[in-house]
Every structure is written in C-alpha cells, then in structure tokens.
Amino acid sequence: MTRSRASVALVVGGAGVVLILLALFRLVSPGRVREASTHSLLDTESFRHYFVQFADDEKAMLGKSDPLPWNWFVQNSPWLDVPDKELAEIYYFRWYSFQKHVKQTPSGFVIDEFLDDVPWAGKRNTISAAAGHHIREARWLRNPQYAEQYTNFWFSPEGEPRRYSFWAADSVYSLFLATGNKQFAIKLLPNLQENHTQWERTHRDPNGLYWQIDDRDGMEFSIGGSGYRPTINSYMYGDAEAIARIAEMAGQADVAAEYKAKADRLRQLIETQLWNPDDHFYETVVRGGQESGVRELIGYVPWYFEVPSASHAIAWKQLFDPQGFAGTFGPTTAERRSPRFNFSNPHECLWNGPSWPFATTQTLVALANLLDERDAPSVMSGTDYLRLLNAYTRSQHIRTSDGKLIPWIDENLNPDSGEWIARNILISRHQPPPNRGRYYNHSGYADLIITGLLGLRPSATNDLVVRPLVPLGTWDYFALDGLPYHGHLLTIIYDQKGERYHRGAGLTILSDGSMIGHSDSLSATTAVLSGSHEDEQAKTLRQRSH
C-alpha cells in the first residue's frame, strides 16, 4: 500500500477507525497475506522496500545506481517470508544482484559472472566456471527462457563450455527437474554427449580418472594443486549420470546403458582412488599417484552429485572443526591445520584458505543431499545446515565508509573477519576496473533456500516431496510463494498455529492456489501434481523473449 492509499482511509467516516487500523497494519506488516481467493499468498508490494534500499545502498557505495526494475522482480521472483530478516534480506539482495547479470544479446539471454568485461571471459563476457550455479538459480524464475536460452548458449558456436570445469549435463538435468520440460533436455542430448566425449579426449587418463589444473577449476593457488581433483571427477560422474537419465527419457536405451556404465566406473574410482582412508576425506591426487595429503573444501563436492557411500559421511566432522574448515563468515577452502594454510602469495585470488562463496554453495548443496538420504547419518543435521547457511548469509555484507553494514557480494573473503580480500587488494593497487567484484555472480543462494532449507526436492515425476531442514522450534512460520515448478506455481507454507497465513496449522503445499499436500507438523510432506501446464504469465514471458 502506498502512502496516498493509506491517507484515503484517514478521511473515511463511520467505519474510518477500522479502515485506519487496517491501513496501518498493512503498512507495517512485512509479509502481509492476500485474501484466500487469490492464487498469490503474499503481497509483493510488502517486499518492495528491500529493493528500494538496495538501490539506495548501491548509489551510496558506487556513486550511482541502475533504475529499479521492479516489474522484473514481480514477474519472475519467488517470494519469501521468514522470521529471520537477515536471511530474507540476502535472499532478495541476491535476486537484485542476479538480475543485473541477465543480459539480452543477439544470441539470446546469457548470464555473466562479472558486470565489467574481463579478459579471461569468453564471448558475451561469459565464463563457464559458475554456469552450473547460474542455471540452478535461474531455473526458479518465472520466465523459463532465461535459463533455457543461457543453457543453449553454451552449446552454440559462441559457447566455450570446456574453458573451465563445468557440470553441464547435470545442470541441464537439474533444469528439467524444475521445469518439467523434458523435450528441452532431450534436444540437447547430442551436444551433451559430444561435450562429454571431448572431456574424455583431453582430460581423462588411461587409469580412468580426470585431471584438471586448479586454475581451470576456477580455484587457483590451491594447496592440493592440479591433478585428479574431486571436483572434475565428480562433475564428470554427474554428467554421465545425467546423460544416462536424459537418454532414458529419449528412449535411447543403448546410450543410457553406456553412460550409466561410465558413471558407475568413475564412481568406483572416486571412492577408491580419491578417498584418503587415513584422513577420512576425498583429496586431490597428483597425476603421478601421490596424494596431496590435505583436506580441502572441494572434498565435499562428491556429495553434490551423490557419489559417496554412507560410511564416508565421517568427512563432515571437519566442517565445523576449529582446525578443519570452521569460519565465522563461511568455511575455509583448506583445513586450518595444514602447514600451508594461507601460504603467502601476492595474487588476490587464492584458494589456500580464504572463504569462497562458489565453494560454500557447492558445500551447502552437498550437505542438503546428505541430509536428504533416507538413512542419513547422524553426523550432520538440519541444525548444521542452518548454521552453515547463516555463516554464508552473514558473509554477504560490507561496511560503508560511514559505518553502515549493507548487503554485498564480492570475490573471496577472510573467514574470520568477513573482509573482502580481493576487493581490498585491488583497491590498494588502484587496479582497474574499479569495484571489479561488485555483485560477483559466482555462487548461488535462492536455490539453497528453496531446495535445501525449505526442502523442495525436485523430481522427474509429478510426485512432490517437501522435506524442510529448518530445525524444529527454530521458526514459527515460513512461506515461499509463486515458485514455478513443472508448469505450476507452488506455495509452500509452514504456520505453527495457523494464525499467520490462515491456511491451517502445519506444513501446507499449494499448487496454483489449491491445497495438494498437508502435514500437521514441520515434517516431510508429499503431494502429487496434476498434469503439467504452463501458467499464463510464463507463456506470455516466453513469447515476449522470442
């Protein structure tokens, strides 16, 4: 409600007192609820203040701000209402930041990593290193063309999907899991097979393992260095599994069997060759066969693709160990007990200890997968997921010259102080471009809330599972509204007493405004979607983008 609409209530006689109170309630209620007759639960206007503040902060920090594309957010963003206002603020800040990187080009929509052109980028200033993160975020926007055209770009003549490590096929399959658009994934199957073949030709050794330079993993100056890294091998396992599943959808049983066999073989190698039984961790192995002997955060990447056996969950004990990866502002990229932790190097981008949102995102996805297992080991819990997510949320800030703490995302940071390391080094050198890392798009956030904390586990079928990781007794309520999924718009509500959203007490799932699932408590809830369809707004947006 705008100020002028509230003023109207002040001059109404008779029932004016009621109208005044109603108007004031709507002005101050941050996540106010629409009437039950509408499909949308939350009133988007009640969240506009976040975006206005982001634009104001941008102008104060950078001397200018872009025009606020409010309609873009209204048309595309899923809306979140939670008691944790810092988490809500960063959720909306990351959509504010993400939108800046969605670019319309003659090649269609692309999503870049840096706002300024950088010399190590490819065509359209694109970089494949974080493309997997980009696609997982963009799949939750109402306009499917952002994710689909960007995905197509990587397999066009301009795309360079192997310039950096990139879990391309897994990303395509993850996009399908959200949209339900089977034909889009099937259409890309030949490209995904060719991409996989080229990786085999250039980066697979006779022993069956894949090697990579740490810089080409987007993780330069690491302690473990180059070689058979948990990253590239997990990516290739994930891609082989995804190709097999897409081939099954396409009715190509021979292709599915071929790639399933590739995945099974690589999984065995990861489990036997990259797992260090002494350190109880997945570690880089030098191509000559020598173990690196250092635990690095990338040792959790195998869980991103659900590679590990249950017995290897012991590795997660290192996550919050003071000599492991514990950090107030996010996990370290290497274990603190290593003699080479934070070894001296003048470069601004180091993966020898600083916290990197890229890797923190991978770790949170991996942890959600671990906790989603039916027989999830007790070594980790939803409390641990929220603890890591809170540290990541805490990290996404900067203090202005006048002492104000505002939302911010940049490159790497000090896990103990929250200082943005590369930013400060570049400023001290007067190295252009200024503010290179502003709104740095190398990580995810919304997807971590949607599929991790709030627990929507995307599926290839219309069977829907919501398994929240929110610890019992932590929140009295939460709502995720206007989430596109399999051609429907979902609303996921938890209302302990049923007094905030007035849809009943407990966990409720709505599809296009109609209840399809309910549990009386904050627990795993299942539902079945009706036949997929594309909502009218998504159809319109798709047509406009052509």
What residues fall within each predicted segment?
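Aromatic/His-enriched, Gly/Pro-containing loop or helix-boundary segments
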Residues: F153-R162, S174-A178
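Acidic/polar, glycine-enriched structural segments that form the non-catalytic walls/loops
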Residues: A23-G122, L177, K182-F184, L189, ...
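The feature captures the catalytic groove of carbohydrate-active enzymes
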Residues: T38-M61, L68, E158-F166, T197-K262, ...
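N-terminal Sec-pathway targeting helices
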Residues: M1-V17
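Non-catalytic carbohydrate-binding regions of carbohydrate-active enzymes
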Residues: A168, A250-T284, I314-L489
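Beta-rich accessory regions
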Residues: G13-G14, L21-G31, E258-A261, R265-R267, ...
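Well-ordered alpha-helical scaffold segments within catalytic/enzyme domains
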Residues: F73-K85, G132-R142, A168-F184, S234-A253, ...
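Extended glycan-interaction surfaces of carbohydrate-active proteins
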Residues: K85-R124, E137-P157, T197-Y228, Q268-S355, ...
